[in-house]
Amino acid sequence: MPMVRVATNLPNEKVPVDFEIRLTDLLARSMGKPRERIAVEIAAGARLVHGATHDPVTVISIKSIGAVSAEDNIRNTAAITEFCGKELGLPKDKVVITFHDLPPATVGFNGTTVAEANKK
């Protein structure tokens, strides 16, 4: 169940209308997770600096139960960075991604935790 937050200092009108849908599809393929379980939040127009400049940048946080091993992160970083380059016009050094592996007991969904739902 990946939960993704994309913060960028680009204004909302510079982010394609269906960006989050296409990012969901990319993550489903790259992470091997069903698209129905992926949540993507876009925070365009964020007051965000990288390297002490206001140059266009995106900072992405991906929280997931699994699919965030060292090998997974290399593959996913390459795919997401390429996607952001094409869709947002960002150079590779302006796409910053963090990956967080979540224990199933720390994720609530459908009225219970994922750990509890997995017991059934």
From Swiss-Prot:
Residue ranges crossing the lipid bilayer per the database entry: none
Q: Name one Pfam family in it.
A: MIF
Gene3D superfamilies in UniProt: Macrophage Migration Inhibitory Factor
Among InterPro entries, the record links this protein to: Macrophage_inhib_fac, Macrophage_inhib_fac_CS, Tautomerase/MIF_sf
Record GO cellular component, one term: extracellular space
Q: What's a Gene Ontology MF term here?
A: cytokine activity
What family does the Swiss-Prot or TrEMBL record give for this protein?
A: Belongs to the MIF family.
- Provide the protein name: MIF-like protein mif-2
Taxonomic source organism: Caenorhabditis elegans
At the highest ranks, the source species' classification is: Eukaryota, Metazoa, Ecdysozoa, Nematoda, Chromadorea
